[in-house]
Amino acid sequence: MTHPTELPLSPLSALQFYATAPYPCSYLDGRIARSQVATPSHLINSDIYTELVKAGFRRSGVFTYRPYCDGCRACVPVRVPVRAFTPSRTQRRMWKRHRALVATVSPLHYDEEHYALYMRYQSARHAGGGMDRDSRDQYEQFLLQSRINSRLVEFRDLDASGGEPGKLRMVSMIDILGDGLSSVYTFFEPDDAHTSYGTYNILWQIEQARSLGLPYVYLGYWIRESPKMAYKANFHPLEGLLDGRWKTLDPARVDLPPVDAALARAPLPGGHSGAG
């Protein structure tokens, strides 16, 4: 276990960091990935997690990690500077289209309707990826376990009758950091075609950060070669963490070191490759 030299000694000096064994990359087919994990998880409070996010870490439940892959630097942590953000014409259109959705912010909690939407989303968008078979316990471990300042946001249609809540359209989990909001995960109604709910959700988070006086919205990792991550490049300006520094990012021009194909496609222990 080591302390990465690029991380400040305080308040992270109480943490330890280790590298995982290689595993198949979930973003790029045929690639092998590794992660660097921050432990122990019970010491990672909101202040410490803010510093970790600024150093490129993310979380899945109480598991805090960042990419640590041999021969590959495709994952670039990105964030939107709230004050400088200017929506595109398409984004303004999406904002206007969905502005009637009612957003309700609450502490993390289990809701059967949320889980049902999650399963529909996974089955439609990520069939065969494993998450489309998540049990309720796995769903809770992935999205509802947190030791930091986290919130669940549900988006529903406005119910004109004033009776029952309107139809659930989207659920989003966010972390509230010292310097911004961090988008954890979002799922939405997959049967609604061409809605761009994901884009609207980020626009909503940017507006929330602005109202809270927070300078950034962290979007996780942008991967140029991954179509699933391409939408993040549509928010301007965008900052990326490159060589340990946050810089304004031009996705069309960013100079990433070439992937070492021999390392990135190395076989997993036991002779299994990362393909498939």
From Swiss-Prot:
Q: Which GO terms describe its molecular function?
A: arginyl-tRNA--protein transferase activity; leucyl-tRNA--protein transferase activity
Q: Give an example GO cellular component term for this record.
A: cytoplasm
Compartments where found? Cytoplasm
The entry's keywords: Acyltransferase, Cytoplasm, Transferase
Give EC number(s), comma-separated. 2.3.2.29
Q: What class of enzyme is it?
A: transferase
| Any GO BP | ubiquitin-dependent protein catabolic process via the N-end rule pathway
**Its catalytic activity?**
N-terminal L-glutamyl-[protein] + L-leucyl-tRNA(Leu) = N-terminal L-leucyl-L-glutamyl-[protein] + tRNA(Leu) + H(+); N-terminal L-aspartyl-[protein] + L-leucyl-tRNA(Leu) = N-terminal L-leucyl-L-aspartyl-[protein] + tRNA(Leu) + H(+)
Recorded superkingdom: Bacteria
Q: Which family does it belong to?
A: Belongs to the R-transferase family. Bpt subfamily.
HAMAP family linked to this entry? Bpt
Its function? Answer: Functions in the N-end rule pathway of protein degradation where it conjugates Leu from its aminoacyl-tRNA to the N-termini of proteins containing an N-terminal aspartate or glutamate.
Q: What is this protein's name?
A: Aspartate/glutamate leucyltransferase
Q: Which organism is it from?
A: Burkholderia vietnamiensis (strain G4 / LMG 22486) (Burkholderia cepacia (strain R1808))
